Amino acid sequence: GREVARVFRELGVHVNFAPDADVNTNPLNPVIHVRSFGEDPKKVAEKVLAYSRGLESGGVLSVSKHFPGHGDTDVDSHKGLPVLYYNRERLDSVELYPFREMVRAGLGGVMVGHLQVPALEPDAKTASSLSRNVVTGLLKDEMGFQGLVFTDALDMKGVSSVPQLTTKALLAGNDMVLVQYNTANAVQEVLSAVKEGVLSEKEVEAKCRKILTYKYLLGLRQPRPQLQVSGMSYRIHTDEAKALVTSLENTDVKTLSLIDIATI
């Protein structure tokens, strides 16, 4: 985490949409799999905390994803809306466990995924990223998260067809919405929602103040050094970073000796 933060800061990047805090218990998961730290909730949580603390100690905001948990799904939310049918007890012990630990640790950011979780949101048409029950009720109120809340990309098929998408994401409690095909239309949508009383101006201002606070903490007012392209490859690919690359030997696999096919 610290090494990633060092490189990010040199490149002028202050937010990393990582780590993946999903517990990947489904071997058929088409989108998380190797992005996850594994299938054990406690081990995933340990690695999420270590990586996130490394990032934030280096001045880069960590963003744990995909709340409330995308690990046990067989649908890619880029292409559809995955459903988690588990009860609350199971969700608390597996999917939500790493997120609770990162909240307790006081880490900075969470990304909410596009999922349908009946145990948390009874409306089958409302994705977790657009659910006030999930974003505000669970993440903020119950779990006590006070950091920045981001949606996953709103151009993903899990939610992209929802009308008034940006407004619904903000009403759910998200602070920032990611990736709009037409930013100007999204801004106009929010302005109209405020004028019509659908979205509170006070709530929008509170989100803006929160975002500006994090920008300040991440160095908004500090002079931005000019990007030094010369020698960057050597500064990024340090000897220490190379030393972290480990060659693994799989002793369970037996190799077959070659035979002389000419004699067959």
Write out the residue ranges for each language-model feature.
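Flexible hinge/switch segments at interdomain interfaces of large molecular machines
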Residues: 20-26, 67-72, 111, 221-228
